Every structure is written in structure tokens, then in C-alpha cells.
Amino acid sequence: MSHSRFKSAKSAMRKLKTEQRKFGDRVSQHTSPRVNRWFKWMAPGLFVKRWMVISAVGLTLMFLGLAIWVKLTPIFRITEFVSDTLGFLTNLLPNYVSGPLILALGLFFVFWGQSRTVGSISEVLQPDNDQELVDVLLAHRRLNKGAKIVVVGGGTGLSTLLRGLKHYSANITAIVTVADDGGSSGRLRREMGMLPPGDIRNCIGALADEEKLLTELFQYRFKAGDGLSGHSFGNLFLTAMAEITGDLEMAAIACSKVLAVRGKVLPATLDDVKLWAEMEDGRYVEGESNIPEAQGRIRRIGCLPESPKALPAVLKAIKAADYIIIGPGSLYTSILPNLLIPEIQTAIAKAKVPRIYICNVMTQPGETDNYTVSDHLTAIDQVSSARLYDAVLVQRNPPSAPVLKKYAAENSHPVYLDRQAVIEKGCRIVLANVMQEDEKSHQVRHDPQRLARVLMRWYGGQ
């Protein structure tokens, strides 16, 4: 099949799915909740109807076998009874009335019996969940058929993106940096030789079904206690799990299973990575937390060891990916640490799937002062000899005046889109409003739902 025919087929499938969704919405609007539930059970792809039919066939065969076993007498009696009943009904009512009436009655009993059976089961499986079992099944099937998405990054930007993406696919692999050496993660790294769990903790919380409660629990920091003060519960939980399972990779996988996480969260490497940066004024700064505090323009960034070994599961996920997303997050301390791993660079460069970089909305003091969009792309190009992106997603409209004023006081400004310089790099530009403002704090962040919607729309058009 040619590329144009393939795109036409994809377009036709998208239109069909859209029409199916619209029909479903119309049915939902004009039917009662109970009838609407029955319609949902008839939806394709649930793997329920086929087993109901097989059960009915099996039950019929059981009665037939029993009848044969007892020398066919029951079949004769049943046939005679059915014949007399049908004769009575056709004498009482015309066949074009009695036939559909009995058919409808039979269907009613089938649906009623099955719905009560499922209801009894769901009361046990989901005693405190208001969501219908059929809705859970529909969502499960839809998400499991979603695209295989690999997201590379770290920090709050990555967890923000995952909150939106998890509504489009359950086949998400988040590749997370392990270069953090500040705060609770840094203490665990120094005192216990533990790889920093902070970013992994945030991503697991973002992908969980009970996201709000789990995030609050994982973010909870102990305020007192020898050795506990300043540590977050999530970091200690992951540390304990790593002690039990043997390493951070197995700890992340185990936590994901325990907490019903959609997708996987993997550390980029299990090596003890330490970042370093060479500033334009000649200074050499070592340590992830020290780089932004150096308050200078970064000329070059690297890590020790020079060539960390990538996790095999990470390389496998990139190879199997349908879609690769880089960012958002701190350019030098959250995104590039992953791309400094040679095997990850090579795997992304070889990928023949759509690859997009999400540019930050604002510049970051100490890391990307006065950076344009093309400067972000140049920084990525400097750590890799091959192209790692096909497009860049840029916020369309600037923040409001109060937000700009607040950020300007911190020496932070909107990232300027130097369109021509980006085009000269052979990079496509995706402009969209993916930002949200906090009216109280005047902070800007990527909006999880808008961001995910724009990214999946762009992917669908490739």
C-alpha cells in the first residue's frame, strides 16, 4: 500500500470512529441510564457478547444431551408444550403481534439476567466505585489499543504531560532522568547509595487512576523526626521497594502494579550519573542542583560516567514505539541527561516514527536565559550527532500582563519563536495554546488535557 493510500485509510478510520462516537453520544442523550448501559454492553471490542453466545449454545447442548440420555421423551413433551402454547397465542393474537412480543420478552429476560449477574459481580469487584463496570471495560479496551508512546524527560513537566496522555493510551513508557542530587532525592542518594527516586515518584503518581490522592500521599513531606524530616513519603516508599526488589527499575515496576498505574515508568539508566556543565565564562560546575545556581550561560553539558549504560527495557520501549515525545521540562537538568546516554540517542535517532519536542513556555533562570526556540533545539543537537526530533510544539499566545510582570522580576521571559531559524533546521512547527495560568500565584504551566489533545491530534495527522 502506498503512503498516500495509507494516509487515506487512516483518515477514513478516524472519520468512522468520530461518527461512532457521535452516534453513541446521541444515544446517551435520548435514553435512560439503564438502557444506555445495555447499549454500552453491545459495543464492539468488549469480548463479552461472544462468551455470552457461547454460554447460551453450551446450555442448549446440555439440555439436548440430557434429553438424548433419557430417550428423547423430554424433547417430545417440550415440543408438544411449545406447539400448544404457540397455537394458543396465534389464536389469541396475530403472529405479527405475538411473535415480536415474545421475542422482545425473551430479549428482556436475557438482558435483565445478564445485567443483574454483572451487577452482582461488580458490587464485589468495585464496592466503593461509582463508575459502572461496563465503563471500566470500555475504557480498558480503548486505552489498551492506544498508541505505544515513549516520553523522555523529568521534573514536573513530564508528570504534567502524563496526566493528560494517560486518557489516550495505557501503552505509555516514561523514561525518567536519574541525575537529581538535591532535596530528599539527593539525601537518599548520598546516605543510602540510592538512585534519586523523585521524578519516578511524580510520574507514577501522575499515571495512577487515583491520581489526586496518590499524588498528595507521595508528595507528603515529614516535618519532624530524626532522619525523616524533609523526606517525602513517595521517595521513602520507592526506596523501601528498591531494597525489597533489588534495584530502582524493579521498584518502579512493582509500584506501578501495586498502584494500578497506566503505563510504565523507567529510569533511563541504573548507573550513578553525575551531571557537569561548562559555562561560557569558563567555569566548570558539577552536580544537577548546582548548574542552575551558577547563573551563567551553558556552553556544554555532560555526565560522569561519560557513557552510561541504558536500561534494556528502555531501549526495547523506544524500538517498539509508535510515537516519541521529548519534554517538557528543564532543558539541561531534566531532558538532556536522558539524551546524554549514547544508546538512547541512537535508538531515538533510528526510530521511524513521529518525534516531537515540547518547548517550555518560559525561559528558566540559570539554564535557558534569553533562549529562543531554536536555541533549545540547538542544545539538543549538540549532545547528539543525529536528529532526535521532527517537530517542535510551541505555545501560541503569550501569558497575561500580570504573569509576565511576575516572571520578569525573576528574569524569566516567554520563549521567543524564531521561526526562520527553526525552519532552517528542517523542523516543523506546531503552534497551539497548551498553557494554563494560576490566577492566584500568576504561574504558568502546561495544561495536561490541552497538551495531550494537541499532541495526539498531531500524531493522528502523520
From Swiss-Prot:
Keyword Cytoplasm: yes
Any GO CC annotation of this UniProt entry: cytoplasm
Coiled-coil intervals, chain numbering: none
Pfam families xref list: CofD
Any GO MF annotation of the entry: LPPG:FO 2-phospho-L-lactate transferase activity
Any one GO BP annotation for this protein: regulation of cell shape
Keywords: Cytoplasm
Residue ranges, compositional bias (Basic residues): 1-15
Cellular localisation: Cytoplasm
Region (Disordered): 1-21
Family matches, as SUPFAM superfamilies: CofD-like
Alphabetized CDD domains for the sequence: YvcK_like (cd07187)
Function per UniProt: Required for morphogenesis under gluconeogenic growth conditions.
Stated family: Belongs to the gluconeogenesis factor family.
Protein name, per record: Putative gluconeogenesis factor
